[in-house]
C-alpha cells in the first residue's frame, strides 16, 4: 500500500518508488480513487462555482497515468455517487470522460453502485465501484454477494462504560 499526494510533479518520484518495490515484477491490480470532495453533491452545494475548475476533478487523469505505465490486468476505482452527475466546464460528465480515458488506456470498464452496509460495514455508505479489465472483455464484473449482518452498533459498544460529553481520556 502506497499513500502519496499525487500531482504531475510528484508522479516521477512515485513511479520510481513503485518500480523499486516491484523489482521487475508486474502489477496485477491497482486499487484507488481520487478525493471525493470535488464530485460529492455536498461539496458542490457548498462551492460557489459548483467545483467547476477544481483541480481535484481531474485527478482521474493521473490515475490513468498509472494504468498506462503499469498496465495491470485489473483496476478498481471507488468514489461517491455524485461522480455520476458531476460536470466539467463544457457540460460533459466527468464519469463519462473518465471511462473514455480508461478505454484509451486499453481497459474495458463496468460499474455498480454498492452499499457498504450490504458487506458487513455498520453504516449506509453507497459508492460507485468501477472495475476495469485490460483488453476487450464482456461480463467480467464479479458477482458480489451481500453478507448477512447480525451485528448492531449498540452490541459492539455494550461492554464499554457510559460517558458523557467532555468525559474520558484523550490519548495522543
Spans of model-derived segments:
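S-adenosyl-L-methionine
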Residues: 1-21
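Short glycine-/small-residue-rich Rossmann-like dinucleotide-binding loops
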Residues: 35
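N-terminal Rossmann-like NAD(P) cofactor-binding module of classical short-chain dehydrogenase/reductase
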Residues: 29-31
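Class I S-adenosyl-L-methionine
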Residues: 20-24, 39-172
Amino acid at each position: 500500500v502506497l499513500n502519496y499526494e499525487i500531482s504531475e510533479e510528484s508522479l516521477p518520484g512515485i513511479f520510481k518508488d513503485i518500480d523499486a518495490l516491484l523489482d521487475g515484477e508486474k502489477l496485477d491490480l491497482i486499487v484507488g480513487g481520487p478525493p471525493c470532495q470535488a464530485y460529492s453533491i455536498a461539496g458542490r452545494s457548498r462551492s460557489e462555482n459548483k467545483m467547476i475548475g477544481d483541480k481535484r476533478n481531474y485527478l482521474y487523469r493521473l490515475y490513468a497515468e498509472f494504468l498506462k505505465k503499469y498496465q495491470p490486468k485489473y483496476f478498481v476505482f471507488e468514489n461517491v455517487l455524485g461522480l455520476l452527475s458531476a460536470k466539467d466546464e463544457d457540460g460533459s460528465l466527468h464519469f463519462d470522460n473518465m471511462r473514455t480515458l480508461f478505454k484509451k488506456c486499453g481497459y474495458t470498464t463496468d460499474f455498480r453502485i454498492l452499499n457498504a452496509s450490504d458487506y458487513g460495514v455498520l453504516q449506509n455508505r453507497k459508492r460507485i465501484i468501477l472495475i476495469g479489465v485490460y483488453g476487450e472483455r464482456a461480463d467480467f464484473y464479479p458477482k458480489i454477494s451481500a453478507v448477512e449482518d447480525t451485528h448492531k452498533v449498540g452490541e459492539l459498544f455494550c461492554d464499554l462504560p457510559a460517558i458523557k460529553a467532555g468525559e474520558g481520556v484523550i490519548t495522543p
